[in-house]
């Protein structure tokens, strides 16, 4: 079981600001607006520096903690953007954490996981977007997938859906083995 960490979201926000500064700088260069170029250049260094520092500290913490517990590392945000562009599934330009979820799930499939569950609060648009893109992809890749939207109600058929998913994940494991082995 792997959960995305809060650090991944924090890194994403810095990366998104870095991307916006890069885009603004490019546009300012094309329009030759020196006053705007200076501001975007400052933002580029600020957010790039923040992201570098955050990733560096995260690696240090994960290195120490992983000696004590089995902890999966987060994906590098720039790598997730590359995955989305490579697969042509979604664009970081649209924003929201859907870009993290979609690319992260593609990476987990590449790493050999035997099933994926998308757990989200009921009516969360980024997760609904993720589901709309990932469900057909997982069907095509023949990887067990379950959407689990939660609110305060009891949903009929939830237990059956979970049992079915677990059975499919077990069959996938028997057919393809454990990831990383």
Label every PLM stretch briefly.
Residues 1-181:
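An N-terminal assembly and electron-transfer interface module characteristic of large anaerobic redox
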């Amino acid at each position: 079981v792997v959960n995305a960490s809060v650090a991944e979201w924090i890194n994403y926000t810095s990366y998104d600001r870095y991307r916006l500064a890069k885009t603004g700088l490019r546009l300012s260069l094309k329009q030759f607006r020196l006053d705007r170029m200076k501001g975007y250049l400052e933002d580029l260094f600020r957010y790039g520096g923040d992201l570098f520092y955050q990733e560096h500290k995260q690696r240090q913490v994960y290195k120490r903690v992983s000696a004590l517990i089995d902890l999966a590392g987060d994906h590098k945000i720039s790598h997730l953007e590359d995955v989305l562009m490579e697969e042509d599934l979604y664009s970081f330009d649209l924003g929201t954490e859907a870009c993290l979820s979609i690319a992260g799930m593609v990476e987990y499939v590449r790493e050999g996981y035997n099933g994926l569950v998308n757990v989200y609060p009921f009516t969360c648009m980024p997760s609904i977007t993720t589901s709309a893109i990932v469900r057909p992809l997982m069907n095509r890749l023949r990887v067990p997938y379950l959407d689990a939207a939660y609110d305060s109600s009891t949903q009929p058929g939830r237990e059956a859906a979970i049992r079915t998913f677990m059975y499919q994940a077990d069959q996938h494991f028997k057919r393809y083995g454990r990831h990383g082995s």
